[in-house]
Amino acid sequence: ERERGITILAKNTAVHYKDVKINIIDTPGHADFGGEVERILKMVNGVLLLVDAAEGPMPQTRFVLQRALELNHRVIVVINKIDKPDARLEEVEEEVLELLMDLDATDEQLDSPMIFCSGRAGTASLSPYEQGTDLKPLFDTILEYIPAPSGDENAPLQVLVSSIDYNEYVGRIGIGRIENGKMTVGEQVVITNYHDETKKKRTKIVSLEQFTGLGRTPVTEAYPGDIVAFSGAEDITIGDTVCS
């Protein structure tokens, strides 16, 4: 990734704001990594569309936005780097709206909120003419506009594995979002795969972690909407489903 200067694999983190846990996933923007983009978009309830205040929408912006709109995700447009000397705020705002119309966005999607940010300064504002003092306007908009997960913790467990990690102590680690049910350390689960009817392996959850800040925190149980990293299945792969 460093060599190419682009994001290839998604990065997960989570922050707490006003007693709400917000999972944030930085996904690739390039069509070359469409499979990764597809998996990540199915893990989220909404998207922040990051657009450079000087460069405007890029070709990869179109690709990711199109997939997000097709999945009927709510979109918050974040025009970033507004402190650039060559920033074109009004023009870029128009370019984003034109892109949304070109992609046949619904009326609701065309009315997506816009936030004007400086990532370097850590500020956000609802107006292109006002410099923010912190990122509260961005997080308030997320809480107001992006729907919460709709899973049922009393339903059978359902987790789609969207990424794989590895640790020399516990081996392969599956990463995914809990859609329904509750995942608990020590519980017996079944690993299946939609594309391989013969794969039905029973195993035990050995360790369970949630993403917090730039690291992971061990937990004993997790609920719908939580993005978790778990071990216990030696041959788990992307696309597997973990169920009870």
Where are the regions a protein language model picked out?
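Structural and coupling elements of P-loop NTPases
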Residues: E1-S244
